[in-house]
Amino acid sequence: MGCGCSSHPEDDWMENIDVCENCHYPIVPLDGKATLLFRNGSEVRDPLVRYEGSNPPASPLQDNLVIALHSYKPSHDGDLGFEKGEQLRILEQNGEWWKAQSLTTGQEGFIPFNFVAKANSLEPEPWFFKNLSRKDAERQLLAPGNTHGSFLIRESESTAGSFSLSVRDFDQNQGEVVKHYKIRNLDNGGFYISPRITFPGLHELVRHYTNASDGLCTRLSRPCQTQKPQKPWWEDEWEVPRETLKLVERLGAGQFGEVWMGYYNDHTKVAVKSLKQGSMSPDAFLAEANLMKQLQHQRLVRLYAVVTQEPIYIITEYMENGSLVDFLKTPSGIKLTINKLLDMAAQIAEGMAFIEERNYIHRDLRAANILVSDTLSCKIADFGLARLIEDNEYTAREGAKFPIKWTAPEAINYGTFTIKSDVWSFGILLTEIVTHGRIPYPGMTNPEVIQNLERGYRMVRPDNCPEELYHLMMLCWKERPEDRPTFDYLRSVLEDFFTATEGQYQPQP
């Protein structure tokens, strides 16, 4: 154990303390004796010496106990209400609604899985985030509501059983940033960031660095703030009666209908898209919707339910900030930095990489079909619907509604839509993002765009667009579809854009 000059996949971006300058691995203390020291009231242990574990093994009867992170009021026949902090025993764990029994009342029923956490574990701690990537940790900590010193501990992406500490900090050159520290494991089950001081558990580690920075970039202030999760959709409610929906506020009107904010059964806030009669076959729509509801990913707008009698209703999760193309033009959208704009692009690429992996096609990828949450999370909407539209103004390339400026040449000329034509559209979407919602090919009509594309023309680099981002756009606009990159590649480049293109990493302290 100790400095052995062997690298670790995460070491090049992790902040570490007391490390070898060559290999970045913790320096082995010269004295290997099992000395016990006390520092700021905490016991300090030698990280290179085995200590007998003091924690008794967990009882198998505790494995199915959970604790409520939020209160929940029952709203369905068969679900179970509970208060924050209440303990429950899980009887059946299936899907997003788990059958449970309250240890307080003895009653049984179904509970939303995302309102509870495993008892006698780290999961109920407000600073612990399970299954969170490094990039999503940065997004969470940089979201509104968090400040200098906000922090979280997450599971390591690359090393099972290990953890990482992520802390929001301020840098004079870069502004608000997130620093990451690897939390290393002791043989006896303890933890340390610096070998100068070790802790029997993560609670003690958090307590220590909350009192003093002690070598970290800043003192830990408070756990990363998150919103109360939305309860999962009740699984049996797919084709729902129109009367269960109350339309409250019209959010917008598109070519094929209107979008409303509303409530389902007076308790669940939803978005409702009402399609104009005759815009698509109800039978074809229901078949496609059954496929669409199987596509579930954090970067895709969740499809909840449908009304299949005309006018067709599509019920989805509600996104507070509306469409990306509109949000980019608001005062809040105009203030977004290039880093945040690139992060939004990375989120969209992540969602499209999932669609790519599932051998699905969007067909109408543009900023108008990306929705934005109040925490600036982006999700892809309306995937797959374009091919169902029975409107010649949309399906014919000469039609006024056909989105020529976003469509790949092979799709315009031959009607050939593939995931690679979606990649072309993504390149156009990147121009919308970097110009805060400007219409592509400014000053050109649709026929002029078609003529220019046939001559090999490509949109010029927009103002304030980094050269490296324009290079990525040009890759998306390769003439031969097979020469265009995958969405997974686009995601990887955009997630670490300045790192990937300039090789800049956070320096080791």
Swiss-Prot record:
Modified sites of kind Phosphoserine: S102, S162, S194
Recorded superkingdom: Eukaryota
Region (Interactions with CD4 and CD8): 2-72
Record has Methyltransferase as a keyword: no
Regulation: The relative activities of the inhibitory tyrosine-protein kinase CSK and the activating tyrosine-protein phosphatase PTPRC/CD45 determine the level of LCK activity. These interactions allow rapid and efficient activation of LCK in response to TCR stimulation.
Top EC category: transferase
Protein name as catalogued: Tyrosine-protein kinase Lck
Region (Interaction with PTPRH): 154-242
PTM annotation (Phosphothreonine): residues: T159
Quaternary context: Binds to the cytoplasmic domain of cell surface receptors, such as AXL, CD2, CD4, CD5, CD8, CD44, CD45 and CD122. Also binds to effector molecules, such as PI4K, VAV1, RASA1, FYB1 and to other protein kinases including CDK1, RAF1, ZAP70 and SYK. Binds to phosphatidylinositol 3'-kinase (PI3K) from T-lymphocytes through its SH3 domain and to the tyrosine phosphorylated form of KHDRBS1/p70 through its SH2 domain. Interacts with SQSTM1. Interacts with phosphorylated LIME1. LIME1. Interacts with CBLB and PTPRH. Interacts with RUNX3.
Reaction equations catalysed: L-tyrosyl-[protein] + ATP = O-phospho-L-tyrosyl-[protein] + ADP + H(+)
Keyword Transferase attributed: yes
